[in-house]
């Protein structure tokens, strides 16, 4: 695995103690793989920072790269949405991030992401 990009469902599952997500993250970190968290995913998952310990720890881990929806990413997301005929900015941000880095995607909704990032491996959590 060259790296791992997490979607919102994976972060929520992590917060709920999902062992599959925890194991996937542990394997990625042990392999010195990059872990990417798109900011749109963080925005969807973050509700109470004081109580979301697992998410806060993950965001502070040195292996984690927080991926902003900056101008180049925003343009790539918009293009992906236009081509796919879909409208979920967060899913497209995950797909753009993973595709550009050749990452595996951890998701609880593989259908949407498989359509957006057909060349990325998906791990259902």
Locate each region found by the language model.
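Short, well-structured N-terminal submotif of metal-dependent ribonuclease cores
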Residues: 1-37, 46-64, 123
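Hydrophobic side chains within alpha-helical segments
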Residues: 10, 47, 91-96, 115
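Structured helix-beta-strand junction loops
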Residues: 31-32, 61-62, 83, 101, ...
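Phosphate- and divalent-cation-binding pockets in alpha/beta enzyme and binding domains
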Residues: 44, 54, 76, 115-116
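Short loop/helix-cap segments at secondary-structure boundaries that form the rim of catalytic
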Residues: 111-119
């Amino acid at each position: 695995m060259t790296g791992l990009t997490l979607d919102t469902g994976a972060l929520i599952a992590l917060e709920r103690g999902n062992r599959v997500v925890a194991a996937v993250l542990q394997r990625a970190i042990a392999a010195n793989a990059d872990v990417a968290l798109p900011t749109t995913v963080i925005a969807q998952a973050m509700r109470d920072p004081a109580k979301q310990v697992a998410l806060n720890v993950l965001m502070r881990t040195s292996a984690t790269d927080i991926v902003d929806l900056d101008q180049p990413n925003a343009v790539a997301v918009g293009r992906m949405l236009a081509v796919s005929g879909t409208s979920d900015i967060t899913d497209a941000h995950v797909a753009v991030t993973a595709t550009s880095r050749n990452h595996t995607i951890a998701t609880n909704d593989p259908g949407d992401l498989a359509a957006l990032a057909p060349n990325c491996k998906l791990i259902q959590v």
